[in-house]
Amino acid sequence: MKSKIWFAAFSFLLIANVCKAQFVKKHGQLSVQGTQLVDKNSNPIVLRGLSFGWHSLWPRFYNEKAVSWLKKDFNCNVVRAAMGIELGDHSYIKDPEFSKQKIEAVINGAIKSDIYVIIDWHSHNVNLKEAKKFFDEMSKKYAKYPNIIYEVFNEPDYETWQEVNAYSEEIIRVIRENDPKNIILVGCPHWDQDIDRPAEDPITGYTNIMYTMHFYAATHGKYLRDRTDEAIKSGLPVFISESAGMEASGDGPLDYKAWQDYIDWMESKKLSWITWSVSDKDETCSILKKSANSEGKWKEEDLKDSGIKVREYLRKYNKE
């Protein structure tokens, strides 16, 4: 009798782990219905995961094994590959081939790990010509994979919404010529704070478009949640493609209460969220210490407090 109970328990755990290991296989092609991100069965889905730091500053973490570890140990069901456009000697502008090699290592790692991946054009400025070329290439190469999400402009800083809108429409047009279905994320002015601007004048003529809001909990208070709530009420689909628990500078102490307030809010709204970042810079938002192996297998002592906390969140909420 005991052996039967043990076998049943073992079988249940095995099935659960197999289902967990096949996240994209289970949920498939994502789309937007109203303001909600949904899976292939039109069921609401919440993506939760981590963003890599700028590829041009922390390229050592841009590999398939690191992605696999984030899925296995952190329970990420999505990762974000943040391709630095101007910053660093190996930015996309200065070294496009190196940049694509690093970004594609994360993309391919996510596909192998059966999780979703955001291809993030990580810039604060308009680089239309370069962006069109890059997204044309990526959308031709990866259109057949439902894992793919495109983020066409990380954080516009001083551009107006009219400028961001015009830029985004051109990039969307390029992507949609090759990839008619996968989700596209569009940024908004003031480092993705002014989510009310696209709510007043959204992009039209395309489907499966979402708009990004970014927060750093120790800086951005309830006012930003209220602003986002109003945008959603107006019909705007929102995706939190970057966030964390410290100040907007990326440094300073973690504000655990403010962070939890944001987590509770996102969970109540079924908003997908990404935390910044997989890097080892000497600042609070970098989740890793210098001791961290480039390919994952990080021990507790390799994680900073932000890494320990976000892993706790991901393990708790990504139970599937």
Where does each model-flagged region fall?
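N-terminal carbohydrate-binding accessory modules
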Residues: 21-78, 93
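Hydrophobic alpha-helical segments, especially transmembrane helices
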Residues: 3-5, 21, 49, 81, ...
